[in-house]
Amino acid sequence: MAGPCGWIASQGNFWWPAAYVPPLLIVLSTALAYTIRLGLMTLRASRELARLPRVPVPPNLVRNAQAAGIDRIAYVGAGSPVAFCAGLTRPTVFVSEGAVATLSEPELLAVLYHEADHARRHEPLRRAARTAAAEVLTFLPIVGWWSERQIARSELSADAAAERVVGRSALAGALLVMTAPAIPLAAFVGHAELRARRLLGMGIDEPKPPRAVWAATFVYSWLALSLAGCLFEVVVALRP
């Protein structure tokens, strides 16, 4: 590997393993940053969830949650119609009082089956891992693009699971009623426009990463490796 510092050629045969040091430094520092970022995201989400005003779950919600295969359900005292799945190790479906009061029985079931699919697939953990990776690997724009694409796929998959049970009409009605929560989690209304296109029978093309994303990923990766090489050259030069 030859970066702008040209440090490899200056090390001689004895230092040939040094060629692996810059990539290793990037991997280790990225892994550390990723672990810290994921931990901070988990801590923040836990604090936000702890602040939610929880109230006893009404019998009809318990019954519908059991029908949807939801093991853990939480009832939130909020007037806005909100539902989301949260919890990295023990996914829990949160439903607000406003959602139960506003939605019809089939629409409520559509929401519950949608969120049950997220819980079954451990979507909160997957989404947190992808988001943390995209934020840490900012020099790899392709990671952010891939993360957003996977989130969209998970929403479409959850919709398909709900539609198979309650039908398209109930799912569409729920999508019109529900709102987004303040916490950036696996909420029911995520990627609403894309999901509406599917419900309307409109074609959804499988997007490909733009060339600009690939180009930026290549350039930023090269710059990161070159910078790591330069830093390593400085360390080698300063060694006794």
Segments and roles (model prediction):
Residues 1-75, 205-240:
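Hydrophobic or amphipathic, alpha-helical segments that drive membrane association/targeting
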Residues 71-91:
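Catalytic zinc-binding patch centered on the HExxH motif and its immediate surroundings
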Residues 109-113, 117-121, 185-221:
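Membrane-interface, cytosolic juxtamembrane amphipathic helix immediately N-terminal to a transmembrane helix
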